[in-house]
Amino acid sequence: MTQDWITVEGARVHNLKNIDVKIPRNSLTVITGLSGSGKSSLAFDTIYAEGQRRYIDTFSAYARNFLGNMERPDVDKISGLSPVISIEQKTTNKNPRSTVGTTTEIYDYLRLLFARAGTAYSYVTGEKMVKYTEEKVVGLILDEYAGKKVFILSPLVRQRKGHYRELFESMRRKGYLYIRVDGEVKEITRGMKVDRYKNHNIEIVIDKLMVEPKDDERLRHSIATAMKQGDGTIMILDKDSDTTRNFSKRLMDPASGLSYGDPAPNMFSFNSPEGACPRCHGLGIVDEIDLKKVIPNQNLSIRDGAIVPLGKYKNQMIFWQIDAILQKYGCDLKTPYKDIPDEAIDTIMNGSLESVRIDKSIVHTSSDYFVTFEGVIKYLTDVMNDDDSAASQKWAAQFLATSECPECHGNRLKKESLAFKVGDKNISEVANLDISELNEWLSTVEDKLEPQNKKIAHEILKELKTRVNFLLEVGLDYLSLNRQSASLSGGESQRIRLATQIGSQLVNVLYILDEPSIGLHQRDNEKLIRSLKELRDLGNTVIVVEHDEDMMRAADWIVDIGPKAGRKGGEVVFEGTPKDMLKTHTITAQYLNGESRIAVPAVRRQGNGKSIKIMGACGNNLKHVDVEFPLGKLIVVTGVSGSGKSTLINETLAPILSQHLYRSLKKPMPYDKVEGIDNIDKVVNVDQSPIGRTPRSNPATYTGVFTDIRSLFVNLPEAKIRGYKPGRFSFNVKGGRCEACGGNGYKVIEMNFLPNVTVPCEVCHGKRYNRETLEVRYKGKSIADVLDMTINQAVEFFENVPNILQKIKSLQEVGLGYIKLGQSSTTLSGGESQRVKLATELSKRDTGKTLYILDEPTTGLHFEDIRILMDVLEKLVDRGNTVVIIEHNLDVIKLADWIIDVGPEGGRGGGQIISTGTPEQVAVSSKGYTPRFLKPMLGI
C-alpha cells in the first residue's frame, strides 16, 4: 500500500520543538519562515538526513566504512520517505576542470557528436582530410600514373634528429635495397648513418616499377606491404617529375602528408591525455613567471634586492654565480639592474649551458670552481614544483602570472582535436556559445551535415536539444558550456543540478531544494516554477525551502515554521494550502495577504551632489559602458541573471576602489577611466563567503567582541586574585581551556566500520573550559555561559557595558538576535555570514564618506528580515554614506534612491546600461524587464 503523506513525528533537531509535520507526496511543498526559525533544520537536517541514513544503512559494513558520518537525526519517527536527493546552493566544485558542460553531461554528448559526425580538416593547410582503402589507392595509381615510373615509399621518420644507423641496418637485413633520405634516394650500405644533429625525413623504398595494367597484382602487393610498413601511410614518388603524393588508411592531408588517428570521444576531452593540449594539460591557461613581479624596481642593484625572490645579497652560491656572469660583461652586483646588458640579463634569467667560473678565494677551494647556471626562472620553477613544501609553493606563486595558453589559445584541446568540425564550428567554438545560441545552432546544424553523418548525428542531436532545453527552462540561457563550475554562484550551480535532475527523468524521488530562486530576476522565476512543477508531474515529491512570494503562491502545500527565530521559533505555525494560509495571521501570511508590507518611501534622497563615474567598462560581456554612481544614496543595480551586474560592481567598481584606497593586488576588469574616486575614503565589500573555516570561529571572535568579553572577565576580582591573563579565557590556547577536548567541547570517537560519533567531552561537558576558569563569574555567568547566550540574551546581559553592547547590538540590528555568540561559523548560512560581516562594519565608526557594496543581501531572508535589514542600510545612508546593492528582490528595489538597470538580456545579449534613475523613473521606462515588475510595487 502506498502512502499519500510523508509524516514527521517528534522532530527536535536544533531549535525544533518536538514538532509533527505532514507533507503530501507527489506535490510541490514550500517550507517558509523567518531566518533561523528552523526551516533548514526540518528539511535538510531531519528529512534529508534520515533519508540518507536509511540509504547508507542498506550498504555492507565494509562499504559504510568509507562513507561519512550519518548520525540519526533527533526525531521519533519519519514515514512515507522516498529515496531523497538534496539540491543545495553551495558551489562545492572548485576543480578548474569542471565546467557547465561536464556537470550537465552535455559536453559528453558533444564529444560523441564530433567523434561520430565530425569532418576533419588539416590544421596546416585548412583542406579537408581524406582516407583511402588499399583498393582505392591501387585504382588511383593505375589511372593517374599510367605509363610512368614510380617509387612506392613507406615513411619511417618525420622531422626527427638522430644518426639512424640501427634503422638502416634493420631495413638492410629485411632485404630492402634503397632508402630515401631528405628527398634523395640512396642505396642502403653497411654502417650507413646520417648527421645526428639535423632533422631528417626518411622513407624506405618498397618497390619501383612502371605502372601498367598487367602489373596490378604486383602493385596491389607492394601497396599492402607499404601500408603495413608505414603504419597505414604511403608515398608515391613520380620519378620523372620528382613529385610525391601521400595516401593513408587514416585521415590525411594529401598536400602536407599530415595524418590523424580515427576520432574517438576521448580525443575531444580536455581531461584526457588523448585530447588535452600538451602545453596547458587541458586547462586553457598557464602559470608563468612574471618578470614585473620578479624585478619590480629596476633602479636597484642585484646586491640591494632588485631580484625580489633572491632578496638582498647573501653569501650564497646563486649570488656568486650571478656575480661571475656579470663580470664577463663588465658589471658587478652593485650595478643598477637597468644598466646591465640584455645578454647578461638573459643569462641570469634563463641560464646558460656554458660553465661559470667562480674564483677559488670565494668558495675556499684549492682551484677555481666551474658550474653551469640554470637561471633564476628555473630556480623559481623548481621551488614551485616542490610537492613536499606547500609553504615554498605559496611563496613562489606570488611571482606568477596566469595567462592564456599560447599553444591552444584557451581552447584546452590539441590542434588535431580542434581541426574537426560539425557544420562550420569546432567543439571549442560550440562550447563557447551561450546556451541560447547553442540551442539555435543545434536546431540548424543537422541541415548542414552530409547525408551519412546526418543519419549518425540524429539521435545525438535529439539528446543534446533535450538537455539544453532543461537549462533554458531554469533561466540559464546566458551561460556557456565552457564556463567553469567554480565561477558559478550558489543559485546558478543549484539550478544546473536541477536541470540535470529533470533530464534524468527519475520518478518516485523526494527532492529537497534550498532557495532555488536566489539570483533570479522575476522574469526567470516563472520558468523556475514551471521546472519544479515538471519535476513534480514526473511523479516526484518536491520540497523547497523558500521565501519567494511567487513560489509560495504556486505551491500545492505550505509549511510555515515560526513564530520567530532561534529559541522563539521551531514550531509549525501553519501547514496547508496557500489559499488557506491567506486567512491566517502568521508573519508570513500577513505579508502575503497585504496586512503587512514594506512601505515605499515618500521622498527619495537627493545625495550629496558628488559621484563616481566609470567610463568604458568592458569586462566579460560589458559593452564599453559609462556609468555614474551618485554618492550619498541607496543605489540598487538590477537586471536579469548574467546581464553583467556582478562584473560591473564586484569585478570593476570594487577592485578599482580597493586598488586606489588600499593598494589591493586584485586587478579590475578592463575600463578606460574613472572619475570622482577621491569623493570617498573607505570601501567595504560585504560578501557571503564564510566568516571562518573552522568550528573554532564564531560571531564573537569575528566581530572582535570576544576580546572585550575576555578583558571584562580578566578585570573581575576573582581573576585578578588568581593572576589570570586574557589568554586564560581563550579556548584556543593552553591554560584556561579543557585539555581533554582541546577546547572543542566535544570528542570524535572513531567507530571503525560504523560512522564516527561526536560526543560531548566527559570532563567539561561541552563547556570548553576547565573548572578553575569556569569559577570566574560575571553577574553569575561563566565565560562558557556567555558564549551559549543568544545575541538577544547577550544584549540584555551586557546593557551596562558600552564597548561590548555596541558590537552585539549591531548583530541584533541586522536580524541575528537568534544566533548564539559562540555558534560555530561552519553552521552559519551564506546570508547569516554576510550579516555578521555587515554588523561588524556597523559597529565600527564610519566616516560619512564610506561606500558599502552588498551582493544579494536578501539571500535567505524572510519579508520581515528584509524590512529589518533595509532599516539598517537606510541608517547608513542617512549618515552620508553610499550603499550599492546588487539585487533582484522587488521590496529592496522599490526602496532605492537610484536604480542602475543592466541588460537587456543575459550573456552576450546583455552588458548595457539600459536605464538609470529613481524607481519611479525606471518603472515608466519601456526598456528591459525590470519596469514591468516594478510598476505594480509602486502602484503605477
Each language-model region and where it sits:
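Conserved phosphate-binding elements of NTP-dependent enzyme cores
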Residues: M1-I940
